[in-house]
């Protein structure tokens, strides 16, 4: 069986969690497919596509249109589409739907319906339209959690299977041998800072977290923010100033290499995920796997992934978040318990397991003997 995986998101200026998903799924599919299978990557036309190279995956092959014309074309129909494949998997709603070849579409969240205020009006319209097309024209829709599945069933009429396939933790996030040196180079002390990792956009709740740091009971620890700016003009220095915090209390590092992220996770007092809305919340899983206590909002997807192994506070509640951070930072036994439970919970997820389930789905959709 020949599977064409769309890797255009990997080349986006802000790949985000969906870009990591595409890379990890591609690599895991290539590693688990077995004899008679082939995975190839496909992108829009770019002069350079080296950023979308995934070990074990063919290509990436370039379609004949640049990104913007390709988006416009796929809003209307299935062409141009990957050639010489039996099935196409689109890891975002941008997909060549409507042709004869089966197309699987991953939908990462239901935010366009549940929290439209956290997207641009144009983004809401586009995602609703493309996810709606997937619901009616895809061979299957894949979602990362039961929470997303429930919302899609509530808001859409699905004419195809809706399949929940969890995510995993990148092997590149293994704690490096020079973790202490990497932390020191950033001016950080192991166990002496809080960490949050997310694309900087309104729904990630960074305003809530910064406000919580100024609240009663919050630990007197610096906050390290890892992630690229997204939409919405999230101005971290302005948030810090508005909260009355010293300028150095919050440090923004932007996007960092995986080795640095692993080192940052390994030294954090806690990983904080205060999102207003998520579909999976990959940082929660990454934190638990790294042996870091995790504090999240009570967004349904985050609670589902945490599986009772995180500290949960109400979405948007700065007072509760401040108190929770204070408890975690001040209670060594609680931290040990969270680490133990988190590692156990994280072991339930893997990219290998996700890829195995996806191959099962592909074989259900492609006629026997194809490829």
Specify the residue positions occupied by each region the protein language model found.
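Carbohydrate transferase catalytic cores enriched for Leloir-type hexosyltransferases
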Residues: 1-371
